[in-house]
Amino acid sequence: MSVVDIPELTYEGRVLDMDQVGLLRRSDDALHDRDELHRRMGEDGYLYLPGLLNRDQVIDARGELCDRLHRAGMLDYSRPVMECVAAPQAQIDAAAIGPFMPELARDNASLHSVIYDGPMIDFYTFFLGGSVRHFDYTWFRAKQPGTTTATTPHHDFVYMGRGTPDLYTSWTPFSDVPFAMGGLMMLEKSHTHEDIVQGCGQTDVDLYCTNRGNAQEVVAAAQTSGRELTGEERQQIDWNSTGAYSSDAIATREELGGRWLLDEYRMGDVLVFSMHIMHAS
């Protein structure tokens, strides 16, 4: 596929400048060359690895995810469950759900076998040259369609940076994602903007104002119950930051330069990226 094959894309209903959109560089040709993988990670800020995972395993995990979404009332009951067609927006309380659904990953053996075992861990063991550890928490997005549900530009260090900085995100689609569905896009060379990396890139989104309202009580109650905050609870808290660099991917590209890079993704693909590359959807 060439850049000319990418259809006109939009962000929140507005057309992207297609002269500033490109394809991700594939790195499946360098899977067994550690030095080259590190060179590309340094140069690009990401490693796009189509077909790294066992597609049948990913499809099996998708089945469990679809069942959970169906039971949660998130799917259109008139369609086959495995199609994973979202329910009408009026039926879904997006504010209560929030941007992530960690319950989809909790105690999910088929999902964990994909993201925390097998080819995924084999890749990281080779890439990093030793044993690796994953987070206990899984950032699982269940994206709804529409012009108001786009993921805003951000980098991941603000969510994960309290411990070691030696971290990588493994974006793993559990659906085939044609361009029309709006898959992940990376802002070219954005990880090289040191002013941003050392500035807003050091924000900690888990900090909140402790002397306003009942924030401490809300957080303590969730911790005591061993659960995540609900979307409604999160709205009661005055957070240090939302984590977003901006609310506008088009304006962010115009400010920082570079192209938005993406591809059509298939189940089995993985996009590995560093903590400081800007991305959105």
What do these predicted ranges mean?
Residues 158-159, 276-280:
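Histidine-centered metal-chelating micro-motifs
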Residues 157-160, 259-261:
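Short helix-to-loop capping/linker segments positioned immediately adjacent to catalytic or ligand/cofactor-binding
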Residues 51-53, 174-178, 189-191:
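Short loop segments at secondary-structure junctions
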Residues 127-128, 160-179, 240, 264-267, ...:
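Short, conserved beta-strand element in jelly-roll/cupin
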